[in-house]
UniProtKB/Swiss-Prot annotation:
Gene name of the record: hisZ
Gene Ontology terms for molecular function: histidine-tRNA ligase activity
The protein, known as: ATP phosphoribosyltransferase regulatory subunit
Source organism (scientific name): Dehalococcoides mccartyi (strain ATCC BAA-2266 / KCTC 15142 / 195) (Dehalococcoides ethenogenes (strain 195))
Listed GO CC annotations: cytoplasm
InterPro entries per UniProt: aa-tRNA-synth_II, aa-tRNA-synth_II/BPL/LPL, HisRS-like_core, HisRS/HisZ, HisZ
Pathway(s) of this molecule: Amino-acid biosynthesis; L-histidine biosynthesis; L-histidine from 5-phospho-alpha-D-ribose 1-diphosphate: step 1/9
Length: 412
């Protein structure tokens, strides 16, 4: 038997039903907020992710890359490891005339995991707002994400906020190289005891500030003001990012959005330049995003600010209750026929489908338990409609009467 690749998943019919349900809720929310759907190719040039330094070396080690063979001049391409960078490239290539662009998409991303225990292909629902700076745009994205999760039936969604420049401002005093800053930050989050002991011994004031930022949590702008006061001179240039952060949470306060400030939740801040947010449902990380004002100019585009987020479909799918999808799932009708009535059966099925109801031809082996009704075409003027749940059969003489019953237009 040939097995599927390690780290890859098959999405079965029930999974895809949930997939489309989540996607439809997200898409409907985006459209009502003024976002327009786009789609980027699965293949992108590797240079899109390397020339601008938008991904860390650690992340680049996890991309699937290969040669796009074209004689001896082929370029190296990758299976996209990220959704935002291709969306930014799409804007630069096609939509620069738009002063403000609101874009949304569904995309799969690919990241190698040598253990095979983590998923190598992940589906994301993404939204980006390009050309708008400031806390109001950040709040719009956060509210859109929360609205989508609420419409999916999730209550008590946890919103965690961080700011990419806060940790960077402190780490810059320790290591000027940005890639090394990412590595050190990840080591600190992973609880690297040796690194923490070294920092405490060699740079005690810096270590104290890092602990202050990473261990304390708050739920208001006052918390951030206290951080500024407690960090003191050892905090480096924290004033500007803290003021930006305070402005952001002030907007959320006005909108009545609950949040937790968790400065240690900024892991993976490769191209982010401001506020970062993460979304959790029952402890499961289901989405996140932030501001990336330098990404578009880094990719060769205009100096446009931008921000965005992604919801993680693979993590949301198993969390959706089948009962939540009843409004989406249409009742299925089974179509049978007797004798030489195949054409009449097709006509009956098409009429039912025109009413927006699923109609399927019966074949031996079909499990009738999955259907609510069965229509048996006995002749052009003879039909039997069976309620498979109540086990009750009614006879009709024309198609219109059958349609009236199945569509609920009138009682039979």
């Amino acid at each position: 038997m040939i097995a599927r690749c390690k780290g890859c998943s098959d999405l079965l019919p029930e999974d895809m039903l949930r997939f489309r349900y989540i996607e439809s809720i997200f898409h409907d929310s985006c459209i009502t907020w003024g976002y327009e759907e786009v789609r980027t190719p699965m293949l992108e040039y590797l240079s899109l992710f390397t020339s601008s330094g938008t991904l860390t070396p650690q992340m680049l080690k996890r991309v699937y890359s290969f040669l796009d063979w074209d004689g001896w001049s082929g370029e190296r391409v990758v299976l996209r490891p990220d959704g935002t960078i291709p969306a930014a490239r799409l804007y630069i290539d096609n939509l620069q005339e738009m002063e403000v662009a609101r874009l949304c998409y569904t995309s799969n991303i690919f990241r190698f995991d040598e253990t095979g225990k983590k998923s190598r292909e992940n589906w994301q629902l993404g939204a980006e707002i390009i050309g708008v700076t400031g806390s109001e745009a950040n709040a719009e994205l956060i509210t859109l994400a929360l609205e989508t999760l609420s419409r999916l039936g999730f209550e008590d969604v946890e919103l965690r906020l961080s700011h990419s420049q806060l940790i960077k401002a402190v780490l810059a005093q320790l290591e000027p190289n940005a890639d090394e800053q990412h590595k050190i930050f990840d080591q600190l989050l992973d609880g690297d005891v040796a690194l923490m002991s070294r920092l405490e011994a060699e740079k005690p004031e810096l270590f104290r500030t890092l602990k202050l930022l990473m261990e304390n949590k708050g739920t208001s702008a006052a918390f951030l003001k206290n951080v500024m006061a407690m960090a003191g001179a050892a905090g480096g240039d924290l004033e500007e990012p803290l003021n930006d952060f305070i402005a952001g949470v002030d907007v959320l306060d006005k909108l009545g959005v609950s949040y937790q400030i968790d400065l240690a939740s900024g892991k993976g801040f490769e191209y982010y330049t401001g506020v970062i947010f993460h979304l959790f449902v029952n402890g499961e990380h289901v989405g996140g995003g932030g501001r990336y004002d330098k990404l578009i100019p880094l990719l060769g585009g205009p100096d446009k600010p931008a921000a965005g987020f992604a919801l993680y479909l693979n993590r949301l799918i198993p969390m959706i209750d089948a009962e939540d999808m009843y409004d989406m799932v249409e009742e299925k009708i089974l179509i049978k026929y007797e004798g030489d009535n195949l054409k009449n059966a097709y006509e009956m099925a098409n009429l039912i489908r025109e009413c927006g109801i699923s109609a399927e031809l019966f074949y031996p082996g079909v499990d009738t338990a999955a259907y609510g009704w069965a229509v048996t075409v006995k002749a052009a003027d003879s039909y039997e409609v069976t309620d498979l749940i109540e086990d009750k059969t009614t006879e009709f003489k024309n198609q219109a009467e059958v349609i009236c019953l199945l569509s609920g237009e009138e009682d039979a």
